[in-house]
Amino acid sequence: MAKILLGFMGAGKTTVGRILDPKFHDMDELIVEEIGMSINEYFVVEGEAAFRRREAEMLERLLENEEAIISPGGGIVVNPHNRDLLENNPHNIYLRVDFETLYSRIQNDKAMQRPLFLNNSKEEFKKIFDGRLPLYEAIATHIVDVKDKTPDEIAEIIRCL
């Protein structure tokens, strides 16, 4: 079955996914290719609900490839339908990292414009983070604590699962 890399934005899903398989599936990148605009622009034009629908459709398609390494966006767990799909997948790997580390990573990543980060205060962002934690943990079949580990170390842990 597919290996799904779960975690909040900034957890390292894309970086680790590329190490595990250069042809891995980054759902955000695939959606951007499909819609022809950035996710931030899509949020403004179509709204978050429309984005979450596209995300669910993409997840359904990708889960058909049993050998895939898939990196969904951090909000994949918000949609109950996505959680149902993921609960049937035996390899959901949660890349766990604390809020302050994530916040610092995202704040320092000038190349990636993340709508939920840009449009919320730190306190509001923390509430989103706290709301998703139990969802990640409930769906995870494996939890990898990634703080103080290099992407290569994280990838090696995942290979051993």
Predicted features by range, described:
Residues 3, 19, 65, 130-161:
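NTP-dependent small-molecule kinase module
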Residues 74-76, 98-100, 149:
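Short glycine-rich anion-binding loops that position phosphate/pyrophosphate groups of nucleotides
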Residues 88-133:
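A glycine- and Lys/Arg-enriched "phosphate-lid" helix/loop adjacent to the NTP-binding pocket
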Residues 8:
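P-loop (Walker A) phosphate-binding loop of NTP-binding proteins
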Residues 23, 68, 91, 141-142:
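Well-ordered beta-strand positions
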Residues 27-75, 80-87, 122, 126, ...:
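ATP-dependent small-molecule kinase phosphotransfer cores
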Residues 11:
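ATP-binding Walker
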Residues 14:
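Walker A/P-loop
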